[in-house]
Amino acid sequence: MRACINNQQIRHHNKCVILELLYRQKRANKSTLARLAQISIPAVSNILQELESEKRVVNIDDESQTRGHSSGTWLIAPEGDWTLCLNVTPTSIECQVANACLSPKGEFEYLQIDAPTPQALLSEIEKCWHRHRKLWPDHTINLALAIHGQVDPVTGVSQTMPQAPWTTPVEVKYLLEEKLGIRVMVDNDCVMLALAEKWQNNSQERDFCVINVDYGIGSSFVINEQIYRGSLYGSGQIGHTIVNPDGVVCDCGRYGCLETVASLSALKKQARVWLKSQPVSTQLDPEKLTTAQLIAAWQSGEPWITSWVDRSANAIGLSLYNFLNILNINQIWLYGRSCAFGENWLNTIIRQTGFNPFDRDEGPSVKATQIGFGQLSRAQQVLGIGYLYVEAQLRQI
C-alpha cells in the first residue's frame, strides 16, 4: 500500500530538484531555475533561501543583471570538498580534478603505469592523489574511482578485474581511505560513462544505455534517471551474452560470449594468430601488436582485419536487437576505442539491429530508437565518476 506525500517530503523533493539543476547548469538565476523546475519564482526563492542557510548554495552578484540581488546568479557552495576523478586499469590511470560544483580544474591527464599486483595499483593511485594534493593544497580532495570489471559500490571492493594478472578481490575503498584519510567512492567504468551522460548531456532521455566497446564489452543502464546495478551489482554484462554457443571460450568460463568475437582483445588475438602464419616480412609484430596498429590496418583497408571488424559489428548489432526486445530503451550511446572504426562500423551495427519492434510508424520520430557514438570528451567521461558524490549527497538531504 502506498502512502501519501507529506509537506516535508515535497520540500525535500523540491530541494533536490534545485540542487540537481545547479549541478547541471553550474550557474543559474532564479528565473532560469523556475523555468526548468516548472515552479514559480517565489517558490524557487524560498527553496534557495533554505539551501543557502544550509550552506549548500551561494548567491553572487551578476553585473549584467540590473534588478538587484534577487537577480543574482546562484551556484553550488564552492567551499565544499573537491574530487579527483580517476579511471583505473593495471596499465593506465586517467585523471581529472573537479571542484565542489563538479567543474573541471586543471588539465585532464593520461598516465601509463605498470601494476602487476593489487598493492602496486593502489600505490599508483596514492601517488596520483598526493601529486594533485600538492597542486591544490588548500582543498580537501576526495577520490572517485572508475574500475573495469565487477565492482561492489557499497563496500568499494573490486571483485573481478579482467585486465589484471590477479584474480582475487581488492578492497580498494577501505585500503585507500585508511591510507589517505579521505572519502573514496568506487564503481564500474561503464557506470562512469552513464553518470557522465546523465549529468552532462542536457538533452538526455530518462531511459538510456551506454555501451563501452574496448578491451572488453560492458554496458550500464539508466532507467527512470537512475543507474540500474542489480542486487549483486552485475547488471550490464552485455559482453557475456552468448552469440555462438560453439564459439571460443571466454574468460568467464562460458563459450561464445560477445566479448570473444567483438571486443578489441578478441580482435587482437585473432590478428596475432593470423600474423604468425605470415611471412617474416610482415611489418607488424604479432607479439607487440597495439590497438592503434590494429585500427590503422583497418583504416588502410587490410582485408584480414576488415572482415573481422564487420563480423564484430554484426555480433554487437545482434546482441542489441535482443536487448531492445527486452528493455525497450530507445537511446544507446557507444563509447570505447572501437568507436575509431567509424561510421561504417556503426552503420553495420544499426543494420544488424534492423529495427526496434516497439517502434511504430504512428509514434513520434523523436522516440524512435537511436544508436550513435557518445559525444562527450574523454575528460567529461572521466568526470562522470565524480557524480557518485553528488548522488550520494542528494540521497542524504
UniProtKB/Swiss-Prot annotation:
It comes from the Bacteria. Pfam families: ROK (PF00480). One of its GO terms (molecular function) is DNA binding. GO terms for biological process: DNA-templated transcription. InterPro entries: ATPase_NBD (IPR043129), ROK (IPR000600), WH-like_DNA-bd_sf (IPR036388), WH_DNA-bd_sf (IPR036390). Belongs to the ROK (NagC/XylR) family. This is Uncharacterized protein YphH.
